[in-house]
Amino acid sequence: MNNKTIKAVEKRILRNMMADEKELRVLLETETNGVPDRQLDGLFVKIEQLLARISNNQNKIILLQDLKDE
């Protein structure tokens, strides 16, 4: 395994995760002022998309680490 390549990919994934987490925090702090949930569907979808991307990136890092350890 090329450890340099693995490290570079891990760093890239981590940068993406940090950006997604920052965006997620902004969305989670959005003031909805009692707006009904059915009107916030777009916000909820975006939050779920960011959560899925973060989770997917976590899985990628775990897989890379497992491959490196073999």
Predicted regions and their residues:
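Long, low-complexity or tandemly repetitive, helically biased scaffold regions used
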Residues: 2-7
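Short, charge-rich amphipathic interface segments used for partner binding and complex assembly
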Residues: 12, 16-70
